[in-house]
Amino acid sequence: MLEKSGECRKERKIIMAKVEMQKIVEKMNLKNLTPDVSLEDRAVGVPDTNRPALQLTGFFEHFDYKRVQIIGYVEYTFLKTVDEKEKERIYDTLLSYQIPCIVFCRDLQPEPMLLEKANERQVPVF
């Protein structure tokens, strides 16, 4: 990027040490809805989160899969409008990426199909 003077400046990168998933779970008081998925060797190395609303519609270009995936009311409500076959395709595609975990907010409960597929792919859900 150029400054007003015309000189190039270096982009600043935020460097974050990886944080163990178990520490995040304890600090945030998260309930593990996939207890068969081990958190032992799992860590988060990106300080941001992602709400995968576009991905749930099938758009995965520029997907920030390394981030913790947050399912809020908008994403949850959208999933309620989708038929079972399409939901299965959405979950399969979302979980095909190496996402660190999925967190459901506002006491929203994931569907059994998602929990089953997350267990198969070893992706923790909270």
Question: Where are the model-predicted features located?
Answer:
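Short, Lys/Arg-enriched N-terminal segments with co-localized hydrophobic residues
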Residues: 1-15
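Gly/Thr-rich phosphate-binding loop signature of adenosyl cofactor/nucleotide-binding cores
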Residues: 14-95
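Short coil/turn connectors at secondary-structure junctions
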Residues: 64-67, 98-99, 120-123
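Short hydrophobic alpha-helical runs that function as membrane-insertion/retention elements
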Residues: 100-106, 123-126
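Short acidic, glycine/proline-enriched helix-loop-strand junctions
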Residues: 112-126
